[in-house]
Amino acid sequence: MKKSLLITIFAAVSLLPVHAQQPDSVITEILSASVITEGNITYKVDRTTHFFSAAEVKAARDGRELVATIPNLLIDKQSNTLATLAGKKILILINGIKSTDTDLQLIPASKIKKVDFYDVPPVRYMDMADVVLNVVTSRLDTGWNGSVYTRVGQMYSHGDVALSRVSGNNKLTVNLGGHFNHKRKVWDEETGEFSYRLGGDEYKYEYSQKQREWGNQYSGGVAWLNGKPGDYMLQISADYSFFNNKMSRDRYIDFALNGLKDTRSGVASNDVTTMKPTVDVYFEKTLSETSTLMADVTATSYSNDQNAFTSETDAFEDLLDLRSRKNSVIGELVWSYAKENRTFNAGYRGAFGFLRSDLSGSGVTNVRTGRQRLYGEYSSRHGSFSYRVSLGAENNMKAGDDGFSRFAFSPTVLLSYRLNKRNMLRLRLDSETSMPDIQQMSGNRILIMENFYRRGNAEVHNSTGYQSRLIYSYNIPRKLIVQTDAHYNRTAGFLYDAFVQDGDAWYLETRNAHRFSEAGMNMIVTYIPWKWLRLGVDVSADRQTIKETSSGEAFSDWFFPVYLNASAVWGNWSLSCRQTFGGKMLDGLYRKGLEKVSYLSLTYGWKNWQFGAQCLFPFYDDKYSNETVSFAPVRHVTQTNLRTKNREFGFTISWFFQRGKENHSAKSLENSDVDSGVFRF
């Protein structure tokens, strides 16, 4: 029994999928990589570990509500998902295995022992998310667990059902979901201006347009798990997704050629249907008291049908009729070792994709890509000083005459020093690569307006980013959490949309910039003045710079995003408010306004039921503006009002149940392919 206990705890440290079932005192003793403990939070070199009080567990309906009490986390009432204040990408792990919000909801709050919050993801997950949450549970109950969520609103409606059954060493989970974006009478509005020169002529293109999007999404999945804690774990899972998204746009144009004015009109539509089946096989074996081996294979298939149409007065009609089929396989093998205050992980991941694209009028294009990665990571502690060192060696390739093969290292160094019980200082240095999307490497094009198109570029290659960050943390338990940092990030070969003149037309074409950089500061504060009130703010100041070529002109600008969240609880009632403010962020050759989040949400809980009412953008309209940088050869300015969100009301009902007696928890997919190959309209 002692051997099994040590194995499960060691594996939890390494984020490998073994069940943590031990008393907190044993965990605290074994996890000697801890550098500072203050109240309910234990600080480590790359994460904070959160433990929960009996009152917090009692107040939470399910596991997700409990996890959302961690500083910098919340449940976004608009999307009904776990989120950070700034909306960073989150990867949820349950006992080390990639999981979903739904998986977390199916776990009773009383079964969560602790949560590791990685603000610096381990090397294995570095390219998957900004934040990693590893939820460590005790054994789940044998029996049934289920949840139902529905939302009915003016802009969209949503529903999902999840059910799980645990019996002996087996667990079966089934889920179904549907999302419906309504075709409303309210349209989003945009005004804009294009100014450019072409062939000695001067063009000015002013327009006002209205646009609306609608569609439906369906998903379902089944997963079977069989395993013995401390010995082996096998999971076979399959899921299926169907998406149909439509767009319609009407444009009214004042056109001028060398000062001669004309009035025109234009229409555009886009209809995309995607089917995506996925199958995953996961196996894990405990080799000894200190080592574990894991293998995972994921197969995904995308089937896309895309029909896009654009037309303007006095211009030819442009029709995009695209049929694409993409198949991919991702395989991973990981070995982990952990003993006392030392941990080591080593692994290999290979991702291989094949896309067959049939574009009407252009024939068939075959694209084959591959991404192979070897990585290792070591961490340890010496007194008040802790460190984590990792290295990934990666090769990105695209086959064919216009293909490429690029090799890159992605090292990470993380150092931490304990100043005292409430203060901690860390230094992060790392590098990573990003692969272009399939359609960024495609020559397919779509008409934007007369003499203006968008297209990919077969010659683009992967980009490499370098980050440096000095992080300071301060904690008064269950009262005030502050994290602030100063950072400098630089990306070589940055992927962006360039303005390219080709013949008698302009193209918005994917290219690699010489460099993109940002330097600045960020501060995240969570303040709990009273038990019933929680306030959160995430604010940044960044100086962003882009330089297209080594000898070209650079453009710099400041970006000041602010994210606010407030929540209050009185008995069975809860009120939450979320607001986003910000200036313009630099996106390639555009200064783009930050699309905002704003809502008020009121909920009432009764037994296993929860009833809610929401209003999106109750105080102001969702407006933002975009404009090209000063040296861009084309001037493009837009003002957008997303009227479909303004004062949008929705009502929610959710229900959950948990019945049974002791057993263990569930698993979900480990790897995934999210690049469908659909053309960006």
Predicted regions: what is each one?
Residues N423, T433-Q483, R490-T491, L508-A519, ...:
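Outer-membrane beta-barrel signature, preferentially recognizing the C-terminal barrel domain
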Residues T150-Q154, G178-H182, Y240-K246, K285, ...:
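Transmembrane beta-strands of outer-membrane beta-barrel pores
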Residues A33, G63-L66, N80-A83, T102, ...:
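N-terminal periplasmic accessory domains that precede
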Residues T69, G96-P122, G220:
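Short acidic/polar hinge/loop motifs at secondary-structure boundaries
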Residues Q217-N245, V267-P411, R418, R422, ...:
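Face-selective signature of the C-terminal outer-membrane beta-barrel domain
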Residues M126-L133, D141-E190, G215-Y218:
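Outer-membrane beta-barrel translocator/receptor signature
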Residues Q21-E56, K77-Q78, D119, R124:
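Short, acidic, small-residue-rich periplasmic hinge/interaction motif at the N-terminus
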Residues R64-K98:
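Extracytoplasmic beta-strand/coil segments of soluble accessory domains associated
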